[in-house]
Structures are given as structure tokens and as C-alpha cells.
Amino acid sequence: MAQRGGARRPRGDRERLGSRLRALRPGREPRQSEPPAQRGPPPSGRPPARSTASGHDRPTRGAAAGARRPRMKKKTRRRSTRSEELTRSEELTLSEEATWSEEATQSEEATQGEEMNRSQEVTRDEESTRSEEVTREEMAAAGLTVTVTHSNEKHDLHVTSQQGSSEPVVQDLAQVVEEVIGVPQSFQKLIFKGKSLKEMETPLSALGIQDGCRVMLIGKKNSPQEEVELKKLKHLEKSVEKIADQLEELNKELTGIQQGFLPKDLQAEALCKLDRRVKATIEQFMKILEEIDTLILPENFKDSRLKRKGLVKKVQAFLAECDTVEQNICQETERLQSTNFALAE
């Protein structure tokens, strides 16, 4: 210490430092010492001065010219806080976007899955419908084989469609049973899986009867003598059906003449031919009735007697229709003759 600055000077010796004192700044005057009574209260204790313009109190400190206002620290937000808020908002936005995209993806996947399921169900339904249609067509074309059990006997019967339907029905099965086993349809009771087959027009496929199924038959067979008579009646029944087709053709031709489809100069000759054909048809029906009357059926031949009765009623109905056609032919002939006579006059 002695080497650096020499001997230490006492604090009270300030008179010698006059030349070293900092000079006063321009515009400032040295403070003059005033007694406390003249100074007044301190600045903090003085009443605030009112502003003439606004009427509000304003502080007097720093109001004098040249007075320095105290420096106020500005409230600044840290940059780190702003960056953290921005980062958080970005993270929230990204998470929301990710959630939305996931939800959209899930909804799209669910929609695609539902569409796939619907398309698969539709495809299955179409395939099942096609398979059912193919099965029905095959059954209609080739028929089906059914095992019919009667008492202690088993019969494998081949059933085909004979009623003009697209597939075999119960009536077709009953007819085959009557022809092969010998039990009349009126005495038959066909049972499949505990249910009686009563509706004759119901398709076999609708009842679940397929190729190889087993059907039980309950009913009494006819005697051999009655079977002979039944065959005769069936032959006569087929003949009646053929004659009935001829009668239907006659009726159509007569309707065409009545509606004027044939020239007038040919109508008279056509009516004469129709009249002869109708009379021949009537003779054919009468011959069938005579053949039916020649059949001798005992009282115990119940099925044969019932079948003969039904056949007689059918022939009588066709004979009545023949009479109607013959009357219409006569009326049309008379009308045509009267017209020609009027034209001749």
C-alpha cells in the first residue's frame, strides 16, 4: 500500500481536494442550504396539484422544469413464455388434426366395411336365388325320385310335372302313387315329416321334398278286379279330353266367323262344315257314355264307381257345350241367309 499511493490520507482532509471535485453541469445551480421551516414538507407529503385541463390530481414531483421523472420498469413478457404458448397451440392443433384424420379414417373404413358386407349379402342372396332357380329347373326337367313307404313295402317312384307347372306338385305325386301302388287318390294320405300333404297344387320343393326323400302313404289298395275297371275308366277319360280339345277348336272358328274375320262369300260353306264337325263330336261323346254304361262295377268298387260318376258328369257338360255351339251355328247361318236374300232383292 505504501509503495502504490504512499501514506493514506485522512478522511477529513477534503479541503485539499477542491480541484478534484466534479464541476457542476450547465443549467444547474448549487443547492443552497435552507432551514427546514422554509423547505416545507417533503415531496411525498405535499398535496397533489390539479390539472387545469382535466381537473384530475397530478403529482407535483417532476413538474418543475428540468426535473427528472423516475424511470419505470416496463413489464415485458418473456420470449420463452410466448414460444411455449405457440408450441402448445401448435401441438394442440396437430393433435386435433390427427384426431380428426383418425376419426375420418375410421368412419371411411366403417363405411367401406358396411358396403362390403351389403355387397356380400346381396351376392349371397343372388347366388342362393340362382341355385334355387336352377334346382327348380332341374326338377322340372328331370323330375325327382321319392321313396314311398306303404305298410311294409317301399317303392321308389319317379315324379315329373304333368299338370303344366314348372315343377312337380303334390297332385303329380298322388297320381304316380295311384298308378304304381294302386291306392286311389281319394283314399290316399301322404305324410312327409309328420305333416299331411293336403294341398294338391303345392310344389314339392316348397314342402322340402327333394330327390331321395321319404314319404309315407296310408290307404287301402284296390282289388285286382277293380284295378282292371279303373284302367278302362282312365282310358275313357283320356279320350274325353281329346274330344274336348276338338270342341274348343270348333268354338274358336265360330267366334272368328261371327266377328267377320272370314269373307262373306266363304262364311256359308264354313258354317256348314262346322255344323257337321259339331255333330260328329256329339256322336263321339255319346259313344263314350255308352261305353261307360257297359261297365259293371260292384258296390265294393267304391273308387271305380266314384270315378265313373265324375266322368259321366264331365261328358254331359261337354255335350251341353256342343248343343250351344250347334245353336250358334244355326243362328249365324240364318242371319247370313237373310242378308243374302235381302241383297238379292
Swiss-Prot record:
Induction of expression: Up-regulated during differentiation of bladder epithelial cells and down-regulated during differentiation of prostate epithelium.
Xref: SUPFAM superfamilies: BAG domain, Ubiquitin-like
Spans of repeat Sequence: 96-101, 102-107, 108-113, 114-119, 120-125, 126-131, 132-137
Tissue: Isoform 4 is the most abundantly expressed isoform. It is ubiquitously expressed throughout most tissues, except the liver, colon, breast and uterine myometrium. Isoform 1 is expressed in the ovary and testis. Isoform 4 is expressed in several types of tumor cell lines, and at consistently high levels in leukemia and lymphoma cell lines. Isoform 1 is expressed in the prostate, breast and leukemia cell lines. Isoform 3 is the least abundant isoform in tumor cell lines (at protein level).
UniProt keyword Chaperone present: yes
Compositional bias ranges of the Basic and acidic residues kind: 81-91, 115-137
Keyword vocabulary terms for this entry: Apoptosis, Chaperone, Cytoplasm, Nucleus, Phosphoprotein, Repeat, Ubl conjugation
Molecular function per GO: adenyl-nucleotide exchange factor activity; protein-folding chaperone binding; ubiquitin protein ligase binding
Residues annotated as domain BAG: 246-326
Residue span of region Interaction with PPP1R15A: 216-345
Biased composition (Basic residues): 68-80
Residue positions, PTM Phosphoserine: 223
Domain Ubiquitin-like: 144-224
InterPro entries in UniProt: BAG_chaperone_regulator, BAG_dom_sf, BAG_domain, Ubiquitin-like_dom, Ubiquitin-like_domsf
Residue ranges, compositional bias (Low complexity): 95-114
7 X 6 AA tandem repeat of E-E-X(4): annotated segments: 96-137
Pfam family, one: BAG
GO cellular component: cytoplasm; cytosol; membrane; nucleoplasm; nucleus
Superkingdom of origin: Eukaryota
Region (Disordered): 1-137
Region (Interaction with HSPA8): 172-219
GO BP annotations, alphabetical order: apoptotic process; cell surface receptor signaling pathway; chaperone cofactor-dependent protein refolding; negative regulation of apoptotic process; positive regulation of smooth muscle cell apoptotic process; protein stabilization
Post-translational modification: Ubiquitinated; mediated by SIAH1 or SIAH2 and leading to its subsequent proteasomal degradation.
Function: Co-chaperone for HSP70 and HSC70 chaperone proteins. Acts as a nucleotide-exchange factor (NEF) promoting the release of ADP from the HSP70 and HSC70 proteins thereby triggering client/substrate protein release. Nucleotide release is mediated via its binding to the nucleotide-binding domain (NBD) of HSPA8/HSC70 where as the substrate release is mediated via its binding to the substrate-binding domain (SBD) of HSPA8/HSC70. Inhibits the pro-apoptotic function of PPP1R15A, and has anti-apoptotic activity. Markedly increases the anti-cell death function of BCL2 induced by various stimuli.
Subunit structure: Homodimer. Forms a heteromeric complex with HSP70/HSC70. Binds to the ATPase domain of HSP/HSC70 chaperones. Isoform 1, isoform 3 and isoform 4 but not isoform 2 interact with HSPA8/HSC70. Interacts with NR3C1. Interacts with the N-terminal region of MAPRE2. Interacts with PPP1R15A. Interacts with BCL2 in an ATP-dependent manner. Isoform 2 does not interact with BCL2. Interacts with SIAH1. Interacts with HSPA8 (via NBD). Interacts with HSPA1A (via NBD) and HSPA1B (via NBD). Interacts with SIAH2.
The protein's name in its UniProt record: BAG family molecular chaperone regulator 1
The species this protein was found in: Homo sapiens
Organism placement in taxonomy: Eukaryota, Metazoa, Chordata, Craniata, Vertebrata
Gene designation: BAG1
